[in-house]
Amino acid sequence: MALFRRFFYKKPPDRLLEISERVYVFDCCFSSDVMGEDEYKVYLGGIVAQLQDHFPEASFMVFNFREGEQRSQISDVLSQYDMTVMDYPRQYESCPLLPLEMIHHFLRSSESWLSLEGQQNVLLMHCERGGWPVLAFMLSGLLLYRKQYHGEQKTLEMVHKQAPKELLHLLSPLNPQPSQLRYLQYISRRNLGSDWPPSDTPLLLDCLILRDLPHFEGKKGCRPILRVYGQDPKARTNRSSILLFSTLKTKKHTRLYQQEECILVKLDIQCRVQGDVVLECIHLHDDLVSEEMVFRIMFHTAFVRANILMLQRDEMDILWDVKDQFPKEFKAEVLFSGADAVVPPITTSTLSDDENDFDMTSPEEFFEVEEIFSDVIDGPDHKRDSDSFVVVDTASDDSEGKEVWKGDVEPNAFLDCASDDSNHKHDMHAETSTDPVKDITVDDVQYRSDGKADSNIDSVKDIGIDDGDEQRKRRTVEAKENDSSTVQTQSKGDEESNDLESMSQKTNTSLNKPISEKPQATLRKQVGANAKPAAAGDSLKPKSKQQETQGPNVRMAKPNAVSRWIPSNKGSYKDSMHVAYPPTRINSAPASITTSLKDGKRATSPDGVIPKDAKTKYLRASVSSPDMRSRAPICSSPDSSPKETPSSLPPASPHQAPPPLPSLTSEAKTVLHSSQAVASPPPPPPPPPLPTYSHYQTSQLPPPPPPPPPFSSERPNSGTVLPPPPPPPPPFSSERPNSGTVLPPPPPPPLPFSSERPNSGTVLPPPPSPPWKSVYASALAIPAICSTSQAPTSSPTPPPPPPAYYSVGQKSSDLQTSQLPSPPPPPPPPPFASVRRNSETLLPPPPPPPPPPFASVRRNSETLLPPPPPPPPWKSLYASTFETHEACSTSSSPPPPPPPPPFSPLNTTKANDYILPPPPLPYTSIAPSPSVKILPLHGISSAPSPPVKTAPPPPPPPPFSNAHSVLSPPPPSYGSPPPPPPPPPSYGSPPPPPPPPPSYGSPPPPPPPPPGYGSPPPPPPPPPSYGSPPPPPPPPFSHVSSIPPPPPPPPMHGGAPPPPPPPPMHGGAPPPPPPPPMHGGAPPPPPPPPMHGGAPPPPPPPMFGGAQPPPPPPMRGGAPPPPPPPMRGGAPPPPPPPMRGGAPPPPPPPMHGGAPPPPPPPMRGGAPPPPPPPGGRGPGAPPPPPPPGGRAPGPPPPPGPRPPGGGPPPPPMLGARGAAVDPRGAGRGRGLPRPGFGSAAQKKSSLKPLHWVKVTRALQGSLWDELQRHGESQTPSEFDVSEIETLFSATVQKPADKSGSRRKSVGAKPEKVQLIDLRRANNTEIMLTKVKMPLPDMMAAVLAMDESVLDVDQIENLIKFCPTKEEMELLKNYTGDKTTLGKCEQYFLELMKVPRVEAKLRVFSFKFQFGTQITEFKKSLNAVNSACEEVRSSQKLKEIMKKILYLGNTLNQGTARGAAVGFKLDSLSKLSDTRAANSKMTLMHYLCKVLASKASVLLDFPKDLESLESASKIQLKSLAEEMQAIIKGLEKLNQELTASESDGPVSDVFRKTLGDFISVAETEVATVSSLYSVVGRNADALAHYFGEDPNRCPFEQVTATLLNFIRLFKKAHEENVKQAELEKKKALKEAEMEKAKGVNLTKKPVDDS
């Protein structure tokens, strides 16, 4: 090692330890003391000063192993000295090692730094407190990497010995050397493989087997728990380490093992690892809190061979003093599986304390389950109980934590979780009636070798339905047509809160225990086709209990290791775009929701358990869709459901992506349940499925961003319009037992929007069945409206999936009644607003809050849309279907027409909700909504022009509240006003407006009024003249900012007024009144006023038999409330038509810059409404005349054809370009201008804003409440709008001025054409600023090689910025006006006029520097020549050498070294190293002393060698290179002279000047070349003069040695002189003392006498 230095080796600077050549370590690394800041700066400053003296021309790099993430102190200090400091961490998950990738970076950086040629780079190593162990490892790795040492253990021990042994013990409680040796072996093996470092090989860490257990706690045994750290295999970009797995510290998951009881212990892990992994085995004490490390290992997966890692006792990091606790035979075997391996299910047994509980299953039983999954037969009655589930039996004391797989087919089996500490059996069965299903297969499910399901997300592929017509790879998981399909039974349908409640009666485990123990881990994903979690319940307690009962060594990711549902598409979850695996009950919903639900009397049984028969009826009546098939939940045993890293699953936060929707299966499956309900009138409508299913789906969903409120959604017992932004929602509350009973035929239909009391149980009969074709056609329409397409504007809208359309938040029966048969599922665009919350997951989840749910669905899904009317004849309905399909796409795809009124589902959220029978629907009401496609703007096609601002991806639609779906907040108590929805982003693409669904008992929804900017969209077509109008379409996406909502459709006679839309944010339309409560319901509180200057919402309409809502709604014959005034800058929406026989409401005053709203069409018998007052209408946009009475046609159509069979299209909006409208209606953001009023830009608000603090909810009894109640807030004001516009107009430049100024600016500064890369062009222009002359003059100076005009730096810059061949070609091919080119292009063009301009510039540069170059070169040659002559001709030097030879022979007399005739030149330095016996003098001092006394004339011999010092700084090699450069340069001059002869007149001056220069230069070069030859010979002769070989002792070494001898000689002579003076002074002093002493002696006798 370099520590054993050679004799001449320089001593390193103080306080640095030299590890190898130019590699040093700060000595503070070997101490545990911590220096103060000032002391540390002084310490480093002293070292740096020494380094700079020691290595005057070197560069320094410091590698620092720092503590924590903050900037290191050494960086701050050394940056002042221009030293580079690279920081590395000092550990990896508490292990004093670094990831292999980081080690490789360190080694490569060090190697390249130290091996740079021509530079004496120095590497300094530093570590902060506690970093010595990793620094020692990295130094060892560097020595091995550079092959300076061999043998990993020897090298590591050698480096560790540089520090005190106690330091390593102090800094590392475990001996880190075994893992460090493992990584040193990785480094040593780097040449064996092709690539190093190898790629991170993904593996499945299966289990750990321990043989011959160690003793802990006084030889009691060992209670091992495991933790695994590593990088998240799913986070491709994030390389940081996380906790991948951890054992729960509970009695059921840990066990004390003793050597006498077991030979080996198998600890299951089952987690994915990749790259560097740290595995810790920890002994847990009896208190289950205290821990003691058993061992730790760090390894890299790329070096695992044959899927096993065998470790002896000496190959693990263990505590320093516990080796005696480990038997010599102790071994650990880490077993792996391939990343994609399917672990075969093997027979396993579970032992428990109770000997009677012994279960055994075989692979055959599991494959029986798989067979059942694969062979579900389509039953004509849509009822088949295929209950086959994998049951995991785990015993709490099973040492290996194994599981039992059990498959059985048992109808009406409920989740049974008997929990005593020994037996935990979960029989999870779901009774599922399946619709026609093609094939159900278990696809690529991974099972562990002991039969456990691989609970890691990567390893579990979806158990999906094998659709013949369904695409295998889905970007998103499709929504099932049937709400029962969305029920996603993962465990039994009854395995919801109800059974969990019953289970909780048997379980005694407390809820808080699992939560507090390992909160940071996430849930594991269980295998199952949309399997329900094993424990997601109505109450928290049963859920956690059920998890606790899952067996002993469970490594549960969250306190509740609940199965996660797998999307039902065939592809892996990786292929689904937004398969967010939902959080479980405990993490997703507060317990308060359960309480509030029970308070709302949703459940009557004590524990909220639904009786078996009720559930069975419920299931059989309702669950008959393809999706409600057997799901196979696999409840991992504790060991098989370990913690995953929090990053492995989306966190259960409100911003998680919604879960995927269930996918449709096939054409047979597309026959929605509504078709069954509609087509067969005799059977009662399928009641809603158990809340279990809905709950499971929603409770698992990671909550997306808080959605805005549903349209007129209400809490279960509250009439308030807007629910609060949801917290992580609770699981759905258990339904009342009577909710499962078959619903009786209905009484007269009440209004569908009424919020019923929870206990009301009457349900209306299903609508009359339409003809098959018409039903099929309507099914096409329904799915289309529910999806949004995120394709770019140029791409067509993909066919939407057939998800439930209006089943917003409703239970499965909503879809059953509302969904009609539909064709096989297309690739699934995200469902739009009609999918239940739990099934609505297809929209990509961008951060903006999702739009409100579709049609005023209550949070608890009580109020739903009216039932679908009987479909019209096939042709008409089919036509409307395609309109509907196109209407689903957002404006980012080609604009679909507004969809015709789709069929709204029955309002069957609960058994107690009313199901309204649909009225027969005439054809004209099916597609009354005009299609945007046929609203051309002056003949232009209706393809939507892209929005002015790029629309962000639409936010996910609101999850539709399904009981307490993930996004829905817990229902508040009666009358508690919910908080307003979050404001939508300001820009977005306009979604098409949805058509109002025609229904019998529900008024049409007034779409939200126009938002702050833009004109109102065309109003939706009027629904049929009888029956209540349909509910309002939902507002557009929250980020839609360019489309105004369609005006509210006219209400039908006999129907209650439509519920108004929710209040939009930021200048959006005013909120709608809440839906009227149902009979006996409490009156809802008044709706909150709109946000940001929006007008207050109209009062809610009254309900049948219900209490009057706070604001008096307009009744029949009464004048409806006036529409809210439009927001600033936006055109007002058309006012809603008056009620039958009622006076029309006055239209709102239009605001400046917006088109006036069309007047509302009068209803039958109603007076025509007054025309809107003239306001700030755009030019040429007169208000449309009111339509004639008697019918309710839409506003006048724009030019262009009308849709076949549809109502008249609405008037076009101002400035629209045929953009599509969102199916939900544009409720917020900037409105979409109507086509037809010219293509003027959309006008922004022309008024100054009033920055007030807005009240969003009118408190009951307040002034605003009274104004709302009496409708006064929406009456036309006395203020003159035109005067307001004049006084308070915003300063906006007129378009004419803008265009004029633009023209001026264009004329003043024309556009420059840029052909060259912008960065290069900028750099070129910067360079040209230093050449302050026109380009032609510059080129003339170059050709004349005029050194007075340009300097050498400018010429070098011109050479650097010469055009390349590619740039020349680019400019040559440019055919445009060259005067418009940029300055860089002009410069290049000027250079291109001269042939070979770069060569000419180099000639000029050579000429410029030639004189100086020759002068300096001659000076160097003369210095060398003079030095050689001086040394050889110096007689004094020769005499001194002769005396040294004599002196040496005298000393070496009689030895082999004696009798020398001469000595080598480097022996001169030995004179200073040879000391006298008294150590007071060296041989050099003696020589100088003798010469000074005997031959003082020789002492000034250095004066004869004056040129020696300057010559010693010259390298003959550099002289040779310079000579070669001069000769080559002259050759190039001649070549260019020859070539320029053919250039023509452009090079005449250049050629003449160059010829003259070459003649002079050749003479100079010949002289210098001759001198160079002489100098070379003299340098060689100098080595010969001292008897040296010039090849071994070159001129440079000779001069350096002589110069060093002169320095030492002078120094010794000076010291001799000083010593002589001291001795002389000392002698004088002694003489004086003697003299004084003698004087005293002579005086004494005189005194005596």
Swiss-Prot record:
Give the residue ranges for region: Disordered: 416-774, 787-1245
Tell me one Pfam family matched here: FH2
The terms under GO molecular function for this entry are: phosphoprotein phosphatase activity
Would the keyword Hydrolase be found if you checked this record's keyword annotation? yes
* Compositional bias per record (Pro residues), positions renumbered to this chain: 648-662, 680-691, 701-711, 722-732, 743-752, 795-804, 821-832, 843-854, 865-874, 893-904, 944-960, 968-1213
Q: Which residues form the C2 tensin-type domain?
A: 200-339
- Keyword check for Hydrolase: yes
The record's listing under InterPro entries reads:
C2_domain_sf, FH2_Formin, FH2_Formin_sf, Formin_homology_domain, Prot-tyrosine_phosphatase-like, Tensin_C2-dom
Alphabetized, the UniProt keywords read: Hydrolase, Protein phosphatase
Give the Basic and acidic residues compositional bias ranges.
421-483, 598-616
Source domain of life: Eukaryota
- Record domain Phosphatase tensin-type: where: 1-194
Domain FH2: from-to ranges:
1237-1635
- UniProt feature, compositional bias: Polar residues: 500-513, 585-597, 665-678, 809-820, 878-890
Record PANTHER family:
FORMIN-J (PTHR45733), FORMIN-LIKE PROTEIN 15A-RELATED (PTHR45733:SF10)
Family of this protein: Belongs to the formin-like family. Class-II subfamily.
The protein's name is Formin-like protein 20
Q: Which organism is it from?
A: Arabidopsis thaliana
